[in-house]
C-alpha cells in the first residue's frame, strides 16, 4: 500500500507539472557531452562502490577498495582532460577550479553525509532498539522521527527563502548550519536516555535547521551562483552532491 500511495502521488505530480508549469530551456542548447559523461560515470561509480565496501570495516575487501579508488582517480583524470578538449564540455574546466563550485559542493556533501546518517540511520535505529533505545515499533518510529523531520523542513522552507531575500543567502545558510551543529550536539545527550519525546524534539529541530534552512539555501545557491553561460552545471552537480 505504501508503494501504491507513492505511485499515485508521483502520477499526480506528473500531471500537475504538465498542466501548471511552462517548459524552459537555456539560451543555448549544445549537444550532450557523452565523451565526458562516460569517464565521469565510471569514476563516480568506482568511488561510491569503494566507500560502500570500506563501510564493511573488518569484513571489507581492502584490495578491491584500493583498485576501485585507483580506477576512480583515473576516471576523474580522463574526465578532466576530455573537458579541456571538447567544444561543449559538460562542465568547463575553468568552472571546476572556481571557489563557488567547490565551496558549494563540499558543503552540500559534508552536511548531507552527517545529517543523512543521523536522521535516516542512527535516530530511527536508536528509537527501535529495545535494549539501549526507546523500543518504539517499526510502524510507529517514522511518525516520531522521519515524518516530523520532513514536515518541519516543508513548513520552514518558504520561511527560509523569505529570510534569504531579506538577509542574504550566506547569512541564512550559516544560521542553518550552526543550528544543525547545535541539533547534532543535542543528539549526543539524547542518546543516553532516549524516548519518543526527545527523539521527536531532535527530529523537528534538525528538520527546521537543516531540511528547512541549510538544505534550501544550498539548493538556492546552486542556482544563484551558476554562470550565465552555463546555468545548469552547478544545480546538476549540487544535486549529485546531495545524492
Q: What are the language-model segments listed below?
A:
Residues 2-107, 114:
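Hydrophobic transmembrane-helix bundles of small-molecule transporters
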Residues 63, 88-243:
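12-transmembrane solute porter fold
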Amino acid at each position: 500500500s505504501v508503494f501504491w500511495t507513492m505511485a499515485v502521488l508521483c502520477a499526480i505530480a506528473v500531471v500537475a507539472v504538465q498542466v501548471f508549469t511552462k517548459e524552459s530551456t537555456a539560451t543555448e542548447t549544445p549537444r550532450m557531452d557523452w565523451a565526458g559523461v562516460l569517464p565521469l560515470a565510471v569514476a563516480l561509480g568506482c568511488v561510491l562502490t569503494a566507500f560502500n565496501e570500506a563501510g564493511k570495516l573488518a569484513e571489507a575487501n581492502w584490495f578491491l577498495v584500493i583498485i576501485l579508488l585507483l580506477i576512480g582517480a583515473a576516471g576523474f583524470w580522463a574526465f578532466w582532460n576530455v573537458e579541456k578538449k571538447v567544444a561543449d564540455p559538460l562542465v568547463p574546466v575553468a568552472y571546476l577550479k572556481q571557489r563557488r563550485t567547490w565551496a558549494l559542493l563540499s558543503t552540500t556533501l559534508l552536511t548531507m553525509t552527517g545529517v543523512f546518517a543521523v536522521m535516516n540511520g542512527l535516530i530511527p535505529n536508536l528509537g527501535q532498539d529495545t535494549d539501549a533505545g526507546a523500543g518504539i515499533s517499526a510502524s510507529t518510529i517514522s511518525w516520531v522521527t522521519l515524518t516530523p523531520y520532513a514536515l518541519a523542513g516543508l513548513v520552514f522552507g518558504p520561511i527560509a527563502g523569505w529570510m534569504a531575500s531579506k538577509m542574504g543567502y550566506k547569512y541564512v545558510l550559516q544560521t542553518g548550519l550552526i543550528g544543525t551543529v547545535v541539533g547534532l550536539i543535542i543528539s549526543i545527550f539524547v542518546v543516553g536516555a532516549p524516548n519518543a519525546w526527545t527523539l521527536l524534539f531532535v527530529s523537528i529541530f534538525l528538520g527546521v535547521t537543516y531540511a528547512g534552512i541549510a538544505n534550501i539555501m544550498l539548493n538556492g545557491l546552486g542556482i544563484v551562483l551558476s554562470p550565465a553561460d552555463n546555468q545548469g552545471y552547478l544545480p546538476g552537480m549540487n544535486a549529485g552532491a546531495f545524492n
